[in-house]
């Protein structure tokens, strides 16, 4: 029952995000399994740069308030363990250079979020967000593939995702239940 409740919260949260993006006429693709959104680095940044473009600032100004407002809603906030902003690069170039670039890009998005957060979050919501927000660079790890080939444009991205408090426990329980079911069927 506890597993169903937590899984239900995640499903409800993803549904609430979709609904709010639709109501704000924002074309945002949400990963059905994780609730993550991928922001196109080609819009956010010039190639090989970590300073936000004007178009990127405009995009973030529309998307981040909606995403954060839903996550900070009291019905979900208690379950929220982390809000993560993750930068990724394509597979060309040097790993360490790309690690620095991806970290700088993730930090640029996080910094932008806090520049304006008090205009759409209450003081308590802002405090909670500060306790939960992380910013990470992943270099060229986890590239995006299209038709078996690395999609360089899609691989250059910043993802915004959340993690629920009991998610790790649920994943462990799922593994145990799957192993138990397999053992019983043998």
PLM feature segments, named:
Residues 1-81, 165-186:
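Periplasmic peptidoglycan-binding/tethering modules of Gram-negative envelope proteins
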Residues 44, 49-57, 84-172, 176:
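Periplasmic OmpA-like peptidoglycan-binding domain that tethers envelope proteins to the cell wall
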């Amino acid at each position: 029952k506890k597993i169903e409740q937590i899984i239900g919260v995640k499903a409800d949260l993803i549904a609430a995000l979709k609904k709010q993006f639709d109501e704000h006429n924002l074309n945002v693709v949400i990963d059905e399994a994780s609730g993550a959104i991928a922001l196109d680095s080609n819009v956010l940044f010039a190639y090989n740069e970590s300073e936000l473009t004007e178009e990127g600032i405009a995009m973030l100004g529309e998307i981040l308030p909606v995403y954060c407002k839903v996550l900070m809603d009291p019905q979900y906030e208690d379950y929220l363990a982390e809000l993560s902003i993750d930068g990724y690069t394509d597979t060309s170039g040097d790993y360490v250079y790309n690690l620095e670039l991806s970290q700088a890009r993730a930090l640029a998005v996080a910094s932008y979020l806090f520049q304006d957060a008090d205009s759409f979050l209450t003081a308590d919501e802002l405090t909670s967000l500060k306790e939960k927000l992380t910013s990470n660079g992943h270099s060229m790890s986890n590239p995006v593939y299209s038709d078996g080939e690395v999609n360089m444009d899609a691989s250059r991205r910043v993802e915004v995702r959340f993690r629920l408090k009991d998610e790790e426990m649920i994943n462990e329980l799922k593994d145990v239940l799957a192993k138990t079911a397999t053992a019983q069927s043998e």
